[in-house]
């Protein structure tokens, strides 16, 4: 199967969703996940254009940037599989594919986009920080007697497009030097609300309770994942470290 990708995935009046926009080798379930994610987001973008014409341009640009990110990340994630096949079989077929995937991974790394493993990420609208970074942040949280959360030195809050229900809206997003593209939700947890709770409470259970008291309740595992992500992305830092 031949790989292909569009130079642009959407414009007002046209959306290239799923395989219409790009195709990756059917080496794993990556392509299925990509198509599901693309179709889901395309429906939201189309709905937004119909009910809020003023958001059409922002919506199609959002879709275009997400599709480009998805393609580059799945190509990056497929590189180890091709390299393994090339080492096992040594044929030009696998060697050329391994080289192409490796080159694509380098391009993705140089793009300025956050590096991540997206093998379990369907929509790429939430955090796709490397699991190792999030886990390391979680381990550091567990090592503290007091959370001591303070605002990250490079944290900035800016307005950008995001998904709210079945439409694209302009919303406040959190960005940092480690995550310049910004994010708002992780596992359904509102990061803006979370950082306020975390900075106001030195004990994680108290922060979780405060978060749930101020809005839609989330589970403790989801809260902990979002909290760890906030530290890993540089939105929060440990101002007081007591072990």
Regions found by a protein language model. Give the residues of each.
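Active-site-proximal substrate-binding core of FAD-dependent oxidoreductases
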Residues: 22, 28, 41-97
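Acidic, low-complexity/disordered tracts enriched in E/D and polar residues
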Residues: 116-199, 221-243
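Flavin (FAD/FMN) cofactor-binding core of flavoprotein oxidoreductases
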Residues: 1-11, 67-69
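Short amphipathic alpha-helical face segments that pack within enzyme cores
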Residues: 34-45, 193
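Short FAD-binding loop at a beta-strand-to-alpha-helix junction that anchors the flavin cofactor
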Residues: 9-28
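Short, basic interhelical loop/turn and adjoining N-cap
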Residues: 214-222
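Short acidic, hydrophobic short linear motifs in intrinsically disordered regions
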Residues: 194, 201-214
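Extended amphipathic alpha-helical segments with heptad-repeat/coiled-coil character used for oligomerization
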Residues: 70-134
